[in-house]
Amino acid sequence: MAPAWSLLLALLLLSCNAICSLGCHLPHTHSLANRRVLTLLRQLRRVSPSSCLQDRNDFAFPQEALGGSQLQKAQAISVLHEVTQHTFQFFSVEGSAVVWDESLLDKLRDALDQQLTDLQFCLRQEEGLRGAPLLKEDSSLAVRKYFHRLTLYLQEKRHSPCAWEVVRAEVMRAFSSSTNLQERFRRKD
């Protein structure tokens, strides 16, 4: 379960160093926002993860649909955008405010919103250079279905604190693993 999550959300946190070589110049603040998201996710924890072990689930991340280990940097920008957008929406639903501190959620959404702004700029720049969208429709659909499964899980668990904790912990683990993906891209350069 963790390796699948790792690829999806690790892509979310590729820093400027991994993307800048594409001609997309994300500001230094983008990598600072990544660290801020990690800090905020840590601070959101309200339930002990060990008390929610029975609620863990395999959400079947579609690794192959997104190119797996063959994912190109240009496609990573699109994946980053897609995942960031869904993550933002995920933490913007009404049920999240019941479980977590509203001011922390606001800060998390602000950090994600800034990342979306940076990534949208890069998407427009890269699509302009290539003349076509960077993310294949199959990959986009796979990401949407994946987040839909997460939404269904929360609904099935009635947005319980443990269900939210499972999702938060998985996102946290995935964000933390982004360093490995970043190193992989650096070695390719």
Curated annotation (Swiss-Prot):
One annotated GO molecular function: cytokine activity
Q: Where in the cell is it found?
A: Secreted
Disulfide linkage: 24-122, 52-162
Q: Which BP terms in the Gene Ontology apply to this protein? A: adaptive immune response; B cell activation involved in immune response; defense response to virus; humoral immune response; natural killer cell activation involved in immune response; positive regulation of biosynthetic process; response to exogenous dsRNA; T cell activation involved in immune response
Signal peptide start and end residues: 1-23
State the UniProt keywords alphabetically. Answer: Antiviral defense, Cytokine, Disulfide bond, Secreted, Signal
Q: Do you know which PROSITE patterns this protein is assigned to? A: INTERFERON_A_B_D
Q: Which domain of life is it from?
A: Eukaryota
User: Which spans of this chain does the record mark as coiled coil?
Assistant: none
- What Pfam families does the entry give? Interferon
> Entry's InterPro entries?
4_helix_cytokine-like_core, Interferon_alpha/beta/delta
Q: Which Gene3D superfamilies match?
A: 1.20.1250.10
Q: Name one GO cellular component term.
A: extracellular space
Q: Which family does it belong to?
A: Belongs to the alpha/beta interferon family.
Summary of the function given for this chain in its UniProt record: Produced by macrophages, IFN-alpha have antiviral activities. Interferon stimulates the production of two enzymes: a protein kinase and an oligoadenylate synthetase.
Q: What is this protein called?
A: Interferon alpha-G
Query: What organism does the UniProt record list as the source?
Result: Bos taurus (Bovine)
